[in-house]
């Protein structure tokens, strides 16, 4: 018999989970005027960073910029709590430039809690949510339900471990690694969402009873060591190189505290030998655990097995805060038993006498394959039920925060009777990620990568505000002050681009010889500053050096103008591809098309397209396993066939 009790409280939106997804979802819904409650197992661990205390990196920084451009908070807090900032891939093109910040994990959590407590319309509750209240079919349509049938049930609230019921019109699940969480050290395990915190009970069973498919994934975190026990003076120092760069587009959030250095060490032959001799004692190689872990964040034993030709791997020693001696040993997660972990750490140069404060561990947990969601992150079976973050199979604070904002936004709009917002793949990394999640059958933790986007030159971090802030303002996520800041920046950017296109440098000007020497190309007569920037090797910093650009010009304006000018041809072509793909969405596909012989399609796409036989591109785009890259390849192939047919018919005449 179903448990029933009078409701304890009523809210418009309930968020379950206080991690990075849950916090963004709660703040977003509350700022849109909805009565919102965030439930978490531990209010003292809000927005905790249980693995690497860092924000950003390749593609991840683009996500953070996008969340900020839409009014989210992860970028502001990363700026406010940064211990160190670096620009990655600076020697490559702007499509892959990435800001990365090492953050003070305890300060980050405290500031997020303060922000939540100060947010109007938002209530915080410490409780374990174990059940979902629904009306309609309690089986979610059963095993024969199909998405075309629409929602089989509607969410009405949640139930907690101690029997309280809380009503809501929308519920967002952001449970991270806590659903059925089990942490492993060697062959020893215990129920936990992360070290020192209990796993969540009941929700997996509640989801399965509603017809949802669940599965297991794993992740892991390395040991923490005492900074005072490391011979840092023997190691390569890695200082901050980007203290003047920020994730947030809001200058009021730009805070630069005292910067701290990271340090670099490497594995040795002794490291590799110890691991090889004890592989069978780890959960994966010993067969105790078969959940799939993140491909792009492997354990040290995975690295040594998969890259057997390498005799050394780089390891980074990163501070966890200004007021703690704990050092995060990046790149050194392991499943070895605790009794071997200290010996393993002491094989690293500089760590021969180190003290291990916390052992490394792996955690496996339940997740909900995101093909059961619509692009709004609402579940297809149950109206009003949304999911975000690691529950959807992703890994990373940035991926979680972005999904949380989208889920919170759409949960609020559902309650208000407004249309759901879907982020197109070509418009943002948020859209790229969600499209991948809901359309592909993923069996390992998903991490956003620049290579996942076909439009990465357009989807840069520096222009995230240009791409998304107008939408954020339209949706009510950006306030009037931020909107005015945005408009002023765009005016300054356009003014600078026009100036660079008009102002000319004469061959007789004092700066000309130096700039000619830098580019290896002669200035004949005169040249516009824009054309000068288009030459390889010339940057706006060079123009500043010669008094041709105002050094007081905001960095975002200066770099934005430079990128727009330098890469204008590429940007135009990529935009044309996007526009063409939009136009082609209703283009019909021949019924007898032999996908198996189109070699530019991925193997999975050939199989899925053959099996489904879509009538047009719009239908093809909805098939799980058929990516936007596959659609582009198919479009190019059809155009080539069309030209060949026309050429052949012309030749026949």
From Swiss-Prot:
This is tRNA uridine 5-carboxymethylaminomethyl modification enzyme MnmG. It is found in: Cytoplasm. The keyword NAD applies. Coiled coil: none annotated. It comes from Prochlorococcus marinus (strain MIT 9313). PROSITE patterns: GIDA_1 (PS01280), GIDA_2 (PS01281). PANTHER family: GLUCOSE INHIBITED DIVISION PROTEIN A, PROTEIN MTO1 HOMOLOG, MITOCHONDRIAL. One of its GO terms (biological process) is tRNA methylation. Its main location: cytoplasm. NAD-binding protein involved in the addition of a carboxymethylaminomethyl (cmnm) group at the wobble position (U34) of certain tRNAs, forming tRNA-cmnm(5)s(2)U34. It holds the Pfam family SAM_GIDA_C. Belongs to the MnmG family. NAD(+) binds at residues 293-307. Keywords: Cytoplasm, FAD, Flavoprotein, NAD, tRNA processing. Homodimer. Heterotetramer of two MnmE and two MnmG subunits. NCBIfam families: mnmG_gidA (TIGR00136).
């Amino acid at each position: 018999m179903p448990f029933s009790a009078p409701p304890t409280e009523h809210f418009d939106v309930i968020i379950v989970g206080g991690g990075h997804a849950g916090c963004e979802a709660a703040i977003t819904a509350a700022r849109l005027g909805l009565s919102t409650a965030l439930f978490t197992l531990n209010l003292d661990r809000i927005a905790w960073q249980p693995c690497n205390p860092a924000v950003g990196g390749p593609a991840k920084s683009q996500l953070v910029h996008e969340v900020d451009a839409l009014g989210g908070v992860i970028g502001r807090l990363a700026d406010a709590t940064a211990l160190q900032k670096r620009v990655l891939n600076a020697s490559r093109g702007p499509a892959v430039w990435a800001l990365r910040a090492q953050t003070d994990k305890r300060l980050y959590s405290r500031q997020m809690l303060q922000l939540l407590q100060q947010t109007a319309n938002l209530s915080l509750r410490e409780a374990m949510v174990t059940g979902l209240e629904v009306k309609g079919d309690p089986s979610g349509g059963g095993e024969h339900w199909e998405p075309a049938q629409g929602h089989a049930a509607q969410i009405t609230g949640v139930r907690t471990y101690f029997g309280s019921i809380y009503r809501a019109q929308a519920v967002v699940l952001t449970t991270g690694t806590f659903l059925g969480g089990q942490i492993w050290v060697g062959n020893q395990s215990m129920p936990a969402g992360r070290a020192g915190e209990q796993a969540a009970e009941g929700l997996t069973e509640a989801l399965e009873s509603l017809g949802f498919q669940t599965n297991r994934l794993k992740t892991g975190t390395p040991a923490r060591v005492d900074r005072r026990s490391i011979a840092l003076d023997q190691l390569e120092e890695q200082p901050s190189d980007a203290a003047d760069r920020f994730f947030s587009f809001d200058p009021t959030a730009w805070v630069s505290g005292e910067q701290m250095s990271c340090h670099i060490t490497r594995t040795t032959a002794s490291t590799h030998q110890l691991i090889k001799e004890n592989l069978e004692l780890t959960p994966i190689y010993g067969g105790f655990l078969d959940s799939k872990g993140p491909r792009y964040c492997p354990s040290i034993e995975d690295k040594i097995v998969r890259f057997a030709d390498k005799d050394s791997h780089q390891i980074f020693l990163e501070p966890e805060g200004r007021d703690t001696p704990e050092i995060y040993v990046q790149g050194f997660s392991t499943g070895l038993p605790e009794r071997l972990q200290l010996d393993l750490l002491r094989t690293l140069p500089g760590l021969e006498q180190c003290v291990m404060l916390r052992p490394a561990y792996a955690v496996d947990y339940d997740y909900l394959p995101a093909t059961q969601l619509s692009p709004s992150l609402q579940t297809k079976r149950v109206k009003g039920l949304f999911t975000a973050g690691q529950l959807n199979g992703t890994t990373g604070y940035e991926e979680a925060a972005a999904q949380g904002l989208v889920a919170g936004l759409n949960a609020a709009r559902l309650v208000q009777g407004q249309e759901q917002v879907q982020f197109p793949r070509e418009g943002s990394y948020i859209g790229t990620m969600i499209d991948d999640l809901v359309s592909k059958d993923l069996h390992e933790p998903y991490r956003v990568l620049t290579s996942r986007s076909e439009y990465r030159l357009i989807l840069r971090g520096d222009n995230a505000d240009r791409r998304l802030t107008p939408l954020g303002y339209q949706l009510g996520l950006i306030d009037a002050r931020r909107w005015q800041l945005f408009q002023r920046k765009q005016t300054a950017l356009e003014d600078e681009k026009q100036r660079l296109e008009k102002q000319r440098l004469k061959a007789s000007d004092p700066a000309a010889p130096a700039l000619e020497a830098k580019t290896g190309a002669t200035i004949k007569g005169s040249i516009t500053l824009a054309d000068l920037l288009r030459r390889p090797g010339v940057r706006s910093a060079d123009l500043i050096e010669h008094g041709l650009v105002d050094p007081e010009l905001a960095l975002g304006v200066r770099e934005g103008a430079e990128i727009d000018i330098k890469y204008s041809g590429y940007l135009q072509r990529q935009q044309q591809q996007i526009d063409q793909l939009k136009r082609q969405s209703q283009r019909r596909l021949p019924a007898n098309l032999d996908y198996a012989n189109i070699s530019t399609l991925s193997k999975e796409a050939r199989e899925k397209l053959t099996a489904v036989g879509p009538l047009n591109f719009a239908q093809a785009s909805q098939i799980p396993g058929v990516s936007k890259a596959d659609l582009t390849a198919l479009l190019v192939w059809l155009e080539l066939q069309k030209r060949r047919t026309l050429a052949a018919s012309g030749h026949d005449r």
